[in-house]
Amino acid sequence: MAVVGAGQAGLPIGYFLKQQGCHFLILERARQIAPAWRERWDSLTLFTSRRYSALPGAPFPGDPDGYPTRAEVIAYLERHAETFELPIEFDSEVRKVELNEDGRFRLELSGGRTVAAVQVVVATGPFQTPYAPKLAEKLSTGVFQTHAVGYRRPDDVPQGTVLLVGGGNTGFQIAKELSASHKVVLSIGSRQKSLPQRLLGRDLFWWLTKARILDKNVDSRFGRKLSTRDTLIGSSPGEMTKRFRVELKPRLVEAAERRVRFENGSESEVDAVIWATGYRSDYSWIKLPIFDEAGRLRHRRGVTEMPGLYFLGLTWQYTRGSALIGFIKGDAEFIAEKIAAHEKSKAREAERTPVDAGAYAGLHSEEGAN
């Protein structure tokens, strides 16, 4: 079987597949582990402590109550893959997935190679295609622009007024960092509930775990309600204005040259814009009938309607923790068990039905593959 992606979703499913004794290969488009983490800004610090940032099988090293940096996360993921000897093939971008006539999945890889697999896990995670609104095209070419994925450090941003568009955790964190060296305007489209990173001396996720809030899933009324709300962790609008002197603005509605206008009619002139406006899923490479009329994936806890095809690491795939590095293990173990059961079922079917040698295999290189 094949796993697409060697990041915070691909590694835990790999761990559990090894526990199940499954034969599999992890296909990674980049040349290194966890490319999505390498694309984040240098000073990024997780809002989950090390205690709640570990993958299955290995605790996150260091002070369990401290908060790991981007560099620490990357090093940890690399060690995890090495420790459990996960079979990863780098420089192997999956460009198409379709169904073969024999019922197996056919994966077209970069370089013209193909792989056939009885089962496939898409573990590309929630950070796929950076999104910026059409307004970006109306700004002058003299205005520095980048999506948050392209931001690394304050020195890369021209001096002057910087507009951060996006009121999520990313927008707030980057605004804080830039406020020490730039004039920062933060445009917030919709207000989010602010939660402290620590409460009564305990990490927020200690409380959420104790209250079993992170166990609430999309099948429950409370879980469905939570899934429609985003939360700010460790930041608040009041803190931004008072401590960091960031100017808060409502939704951005218009742009022309260097001028931008907000929903309340106020305007600003900007020298740089950072779009912290999130990501969009891109599954155009999956040529299978698993999407609804609006293009949304149809699944139940990552299990699609097509036998043998699974997804892992989606936002609210099942719970609030489904896309968080330290809480993805529940979904990963669930899917690994489904995969093992499916594999055993196929093996029993093959025993009952005479087939040509090699017709059933967990993973098979077709013509053009190594």
Residue locations for each model-derived region?
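Glycine-rich flavin
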Residues: 47-65, 215-217
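Flavin (primarily FAD) cofactor-binding/catalytic cores of flavoenzymes
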Residues: 1-30, 34-36, 65-370
